[in-house]
Every structure is written in structure tokens, then in C-alpha cells.
């Protein structure tokens, strides 16, 4: 069986010495970030990727998803409990706005997390990646509509 070990020390090195994440706390979007939190997230997600996601890699490839005639979708064996753990840990909300229940962390943290998930189990990452993309698209569409509404209101008075 294949083993996955997340490159936690390497990721930490890049974030600390190349990105200089510790120096970014004064920037918008980085306020909630501190070195202890970064390390804890990398450690937790790395363990989850190695211990939960990587062992499911084969079922994701071999079984895939299936859709019944009545429209119900079945995911590969183990994916539902893994997804439940993923959500329970709060990782889908890393970069989401705290106003809507997110952690408000910068994209660089979500990218590091996605790298671990993708490396451990590409099939599983399609669920989490598509969800993040959908949330981002909805947010941008809502902001665009709000901006157009403000522009129209300002131009009519």
C-alpha cells in the first residue's frame, strides 16, 4: 500500500522563510494568522491526509461515484465519513469570511491544505475543490450585483 507523508516541515519552511508569513499579520486577510496556528493547521491536515484520505485513494479510483435512476449519488466507500470529519474540523472554511462562519485565513493557507489533500487523494480533493470554487463564484457574483445596485442607486439621484 502506498504511504503519504505530508511535507509539513518543507511547507512550514516555505511559509516562514520565503512567504514570511509571520511578517504579514498587519495586512488585510492575515490578521488571524499566527505561527502557532499555521503549524497546528499544517500538522492536523497533514495527519488527516495521511491517515484518513490516503487509505481511501484506491476506493476513489476503483469505485468512483454512481448515480441511480432516482438521482441519488453514492460516493466511494469511506468518502462520506471522511468528508464528515473534514467538515467537523472546519477545514472547508479556512479562507471563508468569518462573518459567514469561516476562519478568514489567507489563500496561502488554503493552498497549502489543498496541496496535502490533493497529494493524498485526488478523488477526494475534487469534492473539496469544487465546493471552494462554488463558494468563491457565488461570493464574487453577489459582490458584483451589490456593486451594480449601488452604482444604479447613485446614478439615479
Describe each PLM feature range.
Residues 1-126:
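Amphipathic, small/basic residue-rich leader segments at the start of a protein or domain
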Residues 66, 131-134, 152-154:
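A glycine-rich phosphate-binding loop feature that marks nucleotide/adenosyl-phosphate handling sites
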Residues 95, 103, 147-157:
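Glycine-rich, Trp-frequent "lid" loop and neighboring beta-strands that shape
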Residues 126-146:
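N-terminal glycine-rich flavin-associated loop
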